[in-house]
Structures are given as C-alpha cells and as structure tokens.
Amino acid sequence: MSRYRGPRLKKIRRLGALPGLTRKTPKSGSNLKKKFNSGKKEQYRIRLQEKQKLRFHYGLTERQLLRYVHIAGKAKRSTGQVLLQLLEMRLDNILFRLGMASTIPGARQLVNHRHILVNGRIVNIPSFRCKPRDIITTKDNQRSKGLVQNYIASSDPGKLPKHLTIDTLEYKGLVNKILDRKWVGLKINELLVVEY
C-alpha cells in the first residue's frame, strides 16, 4: 500500500486534528462523523482510528508502521512510548517540529530533494533516525536556505519541544535528547495502536 496522497481534509474530518498532515482545519459545524453503537465494532473502530491517526500524521505506510511496532515490541520499556519515540526521532518529523517545514509531507520533500544535512552529510532518506547531539542544517546555497527561511520566520518558538533547539540565523537545529511522552505533538492513545 502506498503513501496517502488524496484529499487531506477528508482525513481530518474523520480522525480529528492532524497537524503533521496539513495546516487546514475543517469548517466548524460540519458534523460528518457517523456514530455507531455496537459493542465489538465500537472497540475495533476506536483502535483502528487511533492507528490511522498515527499513520496519517507521520505519513507512514501500513508496512512501515508494522515495522516500527515490531521494533518497539522488542524494547524492554513500554512498547507504546518506544513507538512514539521512534516516530518522533524520524528526520522528516524533526524538521517539522523545528519549524523548517509547514507539514511532514513538506519536510519529506525537503529531505528527498537533498536540501538537508545531518552532521555535515547530505541525507535524502526521510525515515532517517536521528540521535541525540545530531546537528540538522540546510545546504549552504541560497535556494535551500530560501525554502526554509519562510517557514522558520512564521513558526512559533513557544511550540518547540524541549528535546530540540534551533538557531534561526544559521538555519541549524540540534537534537538535545530523546523525546519525553508529554512533548508528542499529537493527542493519541498509543496503547490502542499497539493493541490493534
């Protein structure tokens, strides 16, 4: 199954706010959610929605998400927290959280087009797993800096998570440590995703 490229507002109406997918918001008063009242389907539907929220927010395919759940399951700590840490330490998500891109798909495009350096080396894999003390910069040409400049200027420094720092003048971000659960940018119950 390939990455979702369809209408984003449909997904937001169905699943709720997904800041990584788009900045758009549905019109208030649009009541398109249908309520189903059955026992087993209700529980299944809740778990499926939580999984879909995670998938669409981070821009993952079904196979990628299963691989991350498998890796998190092998860890000795809580599977749900490890899963969220793995997803939050992806390069495309870190660019989004630093404010260098407006959405995670936009950050993926920056990485794919070779505008981003990690520790002085070009990385063109959006799923690259960042580690603490990684330095993320743009290429030293005007085009790359111009792409990131508008997003950094419009981003809110108060929303920056504690595990990241950014130098807006040099277009440089630093990963300080691994993310805490309370700084995840998405309201989700990760245990339901693992149970699914």
From Swiss-Prot:
GO terms for molecular function: rRNA binding; structural constituent of ribosome. It is found in: Plastid, Chloroplast. Keywords: Chloroplast, Plastid, Ribonucleoprotein, Ribosomal protein, RNA-binding, rRNA-binding. One of its GO terms (cellular component) is small ribosomal subunit. PROSITE patterns: RIBOSOMAL_S4, S4. GO terms for biological process: ribosomal small subunit biogenesis; translation. Signal peptide: none annotated. Residues 89-157 form the S4 RNA-binding domain. Part of the 30S ribosomal subunit. Contacts protein S5. The interaction surface between S4 and S5 is involved in control of translational fidelity. Belongs to the universal ribosomal protein uS4 family. One of the primary rRNA binding proteins, it binds directly to 16S rRNA where it nucleates assembly of the body of the 30S subunit. HAMAP family: Ribosomal_uS4_B (MF_01306_B). This is Small ribosomal subunit protein uS4c.
